[in-house]
């Protein structure tokens, strides 16, 4: 069967069988419910299906249907649609039993990695995600303070998940070869995070990093519409240097500051 790859969907198919097997092994999906994003020609799906309890895959390119023929298996369903546009709760109600926990796996299109990550964050049924992403994005997720890659996404993802780096992947292991290298990581959700606090934390962190060249003080002043004169007493009370930038602040400090900030300024 022949298929012409489509640039608009970011199609780069992984061809290394050993790596495909390693991804599935690290995902630990035996007898679990699995979501797969972008099965493509089914190279990963063929390894997942015999091991998983049930597989629900999302493929945006319907011309790949001939490659995704799993009629001999009754534990796989493929939805030919854009994952980002789907109402996942409706899909889960239809395909899985109530209160099912899901493992996500996939080679994420580079151009929509961040929206997919935030959809994972917003979907409590997804317990963990083993994903291949652009190396540059992966290094941001793993980055620590005072590193050029450290940003709002780094802080939010590290708060929500424990992150395991599995393997860096050279571009020649794909067909067609992309212009950049990739990385495989596993995200495992940290449970028992208060939804209200999470909303506040994300709001505070995004505000802190809004403009990279600005100090934390200036960013918070602009984003929360508070004068610097109003904020300075908060900084002094909590021993925060007035010239500090967000990329110098640790995850632990962001957590503490979020709690204190919303109480201090009585912001809901």
UniProtKB/Swiss-Prot annotation:
Amino-acid positions noted as binding S-adenosyl-L-methionine in the UniProt annotation, renumbered to this chain: 12, 14, 38, 59, 82, 107
Subcellular localization(s) per the UniProt record: Cytoplasm
Gene name for this UniProt entry: rsmA
Cited PROSITE patterns: RRNA_A_DIMETH, SAM_RNA_A_N6_MT
Top enzyme category: transferase
InterPro entries, A to Z: KsgA/Erm, rRNA_Ade_diMease-like_C, rRNA_Ade_Mease_Trfase_CS, rRNA_Ade_methylase_Trfase_N, rRNA_adenine_dimethylase, SAM-dependent_MTases_sf
Top-rank taxon: Bacteria
Family assignment from sequence similarity: Belongs to the class I-like SAM-binding methyltransferase superfamily. rRNA adenine N(6)-methyltransferase family. RsmA subfamily.
GO MF annotation: an example: 16S rRNA (adenine(1518)-N(6)/adenine(1519)-N(6))-dimethyltransferase activity
Protein name: Ribosomal RNA small subunit methyltransferase A
């Amino acid at each position: 069967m022949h298929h012409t790859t489509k640039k608009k969907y970011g199609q780069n198919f992984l061809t290394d069988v050993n790596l495909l097997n390693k991804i599935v092994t690290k995902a630990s999906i035996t007898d679990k419910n699995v979501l797969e994003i972008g099965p493509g020609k089914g190279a990963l799906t063929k390894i997942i299906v015999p091991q998983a309890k049930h597989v629900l895959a999302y493929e945006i390119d319907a011309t790949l249907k001939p490659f995704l023929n799993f009629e001999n298996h009754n534990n796989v369903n493929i939805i030919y649609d854009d994952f980002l546009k789907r109402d996942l709760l409706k899909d889960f109600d239809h395909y899985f039993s109530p209160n099912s926990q899901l493992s996500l796996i996939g080679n994420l299109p580079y151009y929509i990695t961040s929206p997919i990550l935030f959809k994972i964050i917003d979907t409590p049924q997804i317990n963990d995600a083993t994903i291949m992403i652009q190396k540059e994005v992966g290094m941001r997720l793993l980055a620590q303070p005072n590193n050029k890659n450290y940003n709002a996404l780094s802080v939010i993802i590290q708060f929500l998940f424990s992150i395991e780096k599995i393997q860096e992947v050279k571009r020649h292991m794909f067909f067609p070869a992309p212009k950049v290298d990739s990385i495989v990581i596993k995200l495992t959700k940290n449970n028992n995070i208060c939804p209200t606090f999470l909303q506040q934390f994300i709001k505070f962190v995004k505000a802190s990093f809004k403009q990279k060249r600005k100090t934390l003080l200036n960013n918070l002043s602009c984003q929360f519409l508070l004068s610097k004169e109003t904020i300075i007493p908060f900084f002094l009370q909590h021993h925060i240097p007035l010239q500090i930038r967000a990329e110098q602040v640790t995850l632990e400090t962001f957590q503490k500051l979020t709690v204190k900030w919303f109480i201090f300024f009585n912001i809901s």
